[in-house]
Amino acid sequence: MEENMEEGQTQKGCFECCIKCLGGIPYASLIATILLYAGVALFCGCGHEALSGTVNILQTYFEMARTAGDTLDVFTMIDIFKYVIYGIAAAFFVYGILLMVEGFFTTGAIKDLYGDFKITTCGRCVSAWFIMLTYLFMLAWLGVTAFTSLPVYMYFNVWTICRNTTLVEGANLCLDLRQFGIVTIGEEKKICTVSENFLRMCESTELNMTFHLFIVALAGAGAAVIAMVHYLMVLSANWAYVKDACRMQKYEDIKSKEEQELHDIHSTRSKERLNAYT
């Protein structure tokens, strides 16, 4: 009988511990973090592969080659974009962890008005700093989304030219890289529908794959923007809750101090009456 009671108490203690742990999870921050990681992964992974596919298309079908020396050509720019992608992946991996940790501390402080993190002035400054930083990152991701739409537009034009070539017989269309600013005005890098390279490019799966990779990268950038907006809502709500918790804590401190003073006054009067009676 005693063993069954002990087992029941143990199970009850484990259940209460699990409920307490689940109650301390910042679900809103968790959803935003998952969305951020998914968006950054799609943008960085698909963007990197799309840039590599662009290099292969330029070298294979447009017969472009890397210039010797330190000249800033399209291939150098693509390499720079790849390094930027590496930095974005690492930076936002760390930033997502920081926001999750901040969410855990904030949730714990809201559950307990006398927590040690968000009730302090330093904790409130950290929350305000995260709000400002997340807002700046949201603006940055909006710029990244707008910039990522440019290659999508370029590849859509190329895909449209290839499609029109197959639909309209005898169409003589040309694709000039100078229209997109990829090469300088003095260079003439264009292919027309009558050339073999153009037909090979349109029939290859590489063009279609690169086009869709850029579309997925654009979707990933949009998901990162949504994650930043979600983070802003979560951080702003946490800031409001923490501010109310601070006010409540000050009120409780003042109330307890007044009660202690009243208790001391009553104790002093009781002692005086007792001394006067004796």
From Swiss-Prot:
Interacts with OPRM1. Interacts with palmitoyltransferase ZDHHC17/HIP14; the interaction leads to palmitoylation of GPM6A. This is Neuronal membrane glycoprotein M6-a. It comes from Rattus norvegicus. The modification N-acetylmethionine is found at residue 1. Involved in neuronal differentiation, including differentiation and migration of neuronal stem cells. Plays a role in neuronal plasticity and is involved in neurite and filopodia outgrowth, filopodia motility and probably synapse formation. Gpm6a-induced filopodia formation involves mitogen-activated protein kinase (MAPK) and Src signaling pathways. May be involved in neuronal NGF-dependent Ca(2+) influx. May be involved in regulation of endocytosis and intracellular trafficking of G-protein-coupled receptors (GPCRs); enhances internalization and recycling of mu-type opioid receptor. Changing residue 10 to A: Reduces motility of Gpm6a-induced filopodia. Disulfide bonds join 174-192. The modification Phosphothreonine is found at residue 278. It is found in: Cell membrane; Cell projection, Axon; Cell projection, Growth cone; Cell projection, Dendritic spine. Expressed in hippocampus (at protein level). Isoform 1 is the predominant isoform expressed in brain, specifically in hippocampus. Isoform 2 is expressed at low levels in brain and kidney. One of its GO terms (biological process) is regulation of synapse organization. Changing residue 202 to A: Abolishess cell surface expression. N-glycosylated. Palmitoylated by ZDHHC17/HIP14. Changing residue 192 to A: Impairs Gpm6a-induced filopodium formation. Coiled coil: none annotated. Signal peptide: none annotated. SMART domains: PLP (SM00002).
